[in-house]
Amino acid sequence: MLPDWACHVEDIMIIEHSAEVRGKTPLYRHLYVQVLAAIAAGILLGHFYPDIGTQLKPLGDAFIRLVKMIIAPVIFLTVATGIAGMTDLAKVGRVAGKAMIYFLAFSTLALLVGLVVANLVQPGAGMHIDPASLDAKAVATYAQKAHEQSITGFLMNIIPTTLVGAFAEGDILQVLFISVLFGISLAIVGKKAEPVVDFLQALTLPIFRLVAILMKAAPIGAFGAMAFTIGKYGIASIANLAMLIGTFYLTSFLFVFVVLGAVARYNGFSILSLVRYIKEELLLVLGTSSSEAALPGLMNKMEKAGCKRSVVGLVIPTGYSFNLDGTNIYMTLAALFIAQATDTPLSYGDQILLLLVAMLSSKGAAGITGAGFITLAATLSVVPSVPVAGMALILGIDRFMSECRALTNFVGNAVATIVVAKWEGELDQAQLSAALGGEMQVETIPAVVVQPAE
């Protein structure tokens, strides 16, 4: 049984669908086509007019800010109303526990995959770079931020100083913490809290409508972000370290379609169908290099695909800090690349230490551009064998690997949501099959707008 707001959204979609039957929506009106065209235009502008391209960074930054502005209320409404509707509060603990088991298992597997591939391919072998010749100042800022991170600090940061502080700062884990506690409180109060729950459910529709409006700016944000990236770093900068970039992209591709593909098949769905289903969100992540930009859309689509709201609200926001498959592959692969490029021998003991440290430091990496680089600095600062100054080697190309990290993280969280929902018995398999098979008229968030802009 869908909540009232979801029924209203479905009514709107039915109206739109009937309009499409009378006259099919032109291809250029689809969001994924617009974003794809914007990415291509940004690449061309950044390449041929780099000075102009570097000045367009505010377009990408502004769009990310717009999306981050709405993430906190989306998470709060989804989680609080989802938990409030639970008759068995023990389910909250079970869902969270199963999600953390999944996150730990696949995060560790991703780290191992990066480690194994780096040993087999050895992308940094033969470079013979002296660490003393590298510009350590270039990575000093990242290293300083890395030193500020600690496990205790990370855990304490989950608890906000004030109730409104979490929403003001937009910290995902803090908002999730408050949302879970508030949802549990509503469930405990019971009937007396029904007016509050009804209000929150009614508020969900205009909030998602606001997301729809903001998503109309996605092509502009993707255009600005891509023009800046190419304009500042240049396509030529990729060629110097093409081996590392190619190895990382191929490894991530295989992890998604082989490892996660096997998990998907075991749980009764196709990874290819899932990727097609979330293609608009993936293009948005590609254009902005931030998985946070597509978080509201992913939560919306996972619920439409048959995952219960309570599972979606717990798994996805938590996964943005604890289930970062792409970041984990990158960390061990990049660390061994630096060691190989600087002729730093690493014993099996050193590599195991690197793996253990990475398992801890990768938790809590934010879903924003550059977070993976800071996390790598945190890992290398604890492992003395690998020179931190070696990070200067990959500083120029990190931005080009950031997209792949974000895409892999994003798909990993989509798979995790479906798997945990199935484990908990909170997945409508028929609805999932219909959504992934294209049999349902499941639209992206922007399609909620009834009257398309002329």
From Swiss-Prot:
Annotated InterPro entries: C4_dicarb_transport, Na-dicarboxylate_symporter, Na-dicarboxylate_symporter_CS, Na:dicarbo_symporter_sf
Disulfide bonds: none
Pfam families: SDF
Entry keyword annotation includes Heme: no
Topology versus the membrane: Multi-pass membrane protein
Top-level taxon of the source organism: Bacteria
Principal location: membrane
The keyword Translocase belongs to this UniProt entry's keyword annotation: no
Alphabetical keyword list: Cell inner membrane, Cell membrane, Membrane, Plasmid, Symport, Transmembrane, Transmembrane helix, Transport
Membrane-spanning intervals of the chain: 33-53, 66-86, 101-121, 148-168, 170-190, 210-230, 243-263, 354-374, 377-397
A GO molecular-function annotation: malate:proton symporter activity
Compartment list: Cell inner membrane
One GO-annotated biological process of the protein: L-aspartate transmembrane transport
GO cellular component: plasma membrane
PANTHER family on file: AEROBIC C4-DICARBOXYLATE TRANSPORT PROTEIN, PROTON/GLUTAMATE-ASPARTATE SYMPORTER
Function summary: Responsible for the transport of dicarboxylates such as succinate, fumarate, and malate from the periplasm across the membrane.
Family stated for the protein in its record: Belongs to the dicarboxylate/amino acid:cation symporter (DAACS) (TC 2.A.23) family.
Protein name: C4-dicarboxylate transport protein
Gene name linked to the record: dctA
